Amino acid sequence: NDYLLENEKKSTGEIIKLLNFYKLRSKVDFIDLSEKYVAAVISLEKFKEIDNSKSSLGKTTDYQDNPVYIDPRNIKLGAKIISKLENIHLAIKKLNLNFVDKKKYYNKSFELGIPQIDLDKLRDKIFGIENNLDELKGIDFKKGCYVGQENTSRIKLRNKLRRRILPVQKIT
């Protein structure tokens, strides 16, 4: 009955504050576990070494009590392993992983039209559907009653999306 929400560390306090605001009378607790757990990106090939079954979006497996899952937004982003902070180095060593500059991951993400960092400029100025959340399976059009649902549904229904974050490739 637990869920893990991954986000930029600098946004954690604000996200927990918003979630607590919107939970109303629900019997739900939001806890900051960023000092205990860490997420690391691994390649899809490494995921296939851990789990030999068919790879699909959101596929989850277990590696030494650490959940490992294919990024549900886009399979080209690879997979992630979530580990206790004190155990991550052991997992990295046993999986024979290499450290790579996180800019490489963010660049790949941006190439796929998946914004991840420094979105402060867009705060309160863009709907989730304009931020590609529908493409990333982050909006459920069958579920009602969520913040912004009326506008998001209207945009989708009328096919009136006027702006969207898109990847741009520079040709030299």
Question: Where are the regions that the model predicts?
Answer:
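Basic, glycine/lysine-rich polyanion-binding surfaces/domains
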Residues: 1-172
